[in-house]
């Protein structure tokens, strides 16, 4: 199995390095990751400047100022030959649950892999300690995919409780929960009297029902949520069509 491994925490982050070490025991792994933390970069792609890369002695590649999406795009189309069999993103430091997936560079890297035609996993740890647990879970999933490919055309967003492996209760297929909108902004003043602003933490849980990713992780289960790139709200199609007809948009300007 050939694996392209990326993340949004940066090439030296403990999550990606722990996972790379575990994966290399049974797979051919190429790390292509940002040279610094790009958390929250979502699906951004660098279009107005060139991208430089640096290859470390162990073969890992850092993309200077690159986003997670840049890294997967370059990895698939230029840096990994032959091309990978699968794209894996993570292990993220902290969860990507519910609405987090909108902003997550970890999830975005997996989405880019799926967009380019490859199976893809995004893996996050609900904390900052037991990366070995998340690595073991990821290896188990990848061995399963090697034995029997999952032909859903979807990304698997995997969130792992920050627990020793022996304390993981099992695995659940979940849906994304949701949070209350985040509204906290933290102002500061620099030495010259200018106001600076920091974006605050995410909102509290709003929808954390039993079938959500929030609930699974809180209860000690690995959460696996299938995600797709198509953002079309198919169930709203007829409602929007009827509304356009009722307000006359398209018949008069």
Swiss-Prot record:
A single Gene Ontology CC annotation of this entry is: cytoplasm
Q: What is its EC number?
A: 3.1.3.5, 3.1.3.6, 3.6.1.11
Q: Which cofactor does it need?
A: a divalent metal cation
Q: Does the record's keyword annotation contain Cytoplasm?
A: yes
Q: Which domain of life is it from?
A: Bacteria
State a single Gene Ontology molecular function.
Answer: 5'-nucleotidase activity
The UniProt catalytic activity note for this protein reads: a ribonucleoside 5'-phosphate + H2O = a ribonucleoside + phosphate; a ribonucleoside 3'-phosphate + H2O = a ribonucleoside + phosphate; [phosphate](n) + H2O = [phosphate](n-1) + phosphate + H(+)
**Binding-site residues for a divalent metal cation, renumbered to this chain:** 8-9, 39, 92
Cofactor remark from the record:
Binds 1 divalent metal cation per subunit.
Q: Which cysteines are joined by disulfide bonds?
A: none
InterPro entries found in the cross-reference section: SurE, SurE-like_Pase/nucleotidase, SurE-like_sf
Where does it primarily localize? cytoplasm
Cited Gene3D superfamilies: Survival protein SurE-like phosphatase/nucleotidase
Cell location: Cytoplasm
Q: Which UniProt keywords apply?
A: Cytoplasm, Hydrolase, Metal-binding, Nucleotide-binding
Q: Which PANTHER family match?
A: 5'-NUCLEOTIDASE SURE, 5'_3'-NUCLEOTIDASE SURE
For this chain, the family text in UniProt reads: Belongs to the SurE nucleotidase family.
Q: What does this protein do?
A: Nucleotidase with a broad substrate specificity as it can dephosphorylate various ribo- and deoxyribonucleoside 5'-monophosphates and ribonucleoside 3'-monophosphates with highest affinity to 3'-AMP. Also hydrolyzes polyphosphate (exopolyphosphatase activity) with the preference for short-chain-length substrates (P20-25). Might be involved in the regulation of dNTP and NTP pools, and in the turnover of 3'-mononucleotides produced by numerous intracellular RNases (T1, T2, and F) during the degradation of various RNAs.
Its name, as the record gives it, is 5'/3'-nucleotidase SurE
Instruction: Tell me which species this is from.
Output: Salmonella paratyphi A (strain AKU_12601)
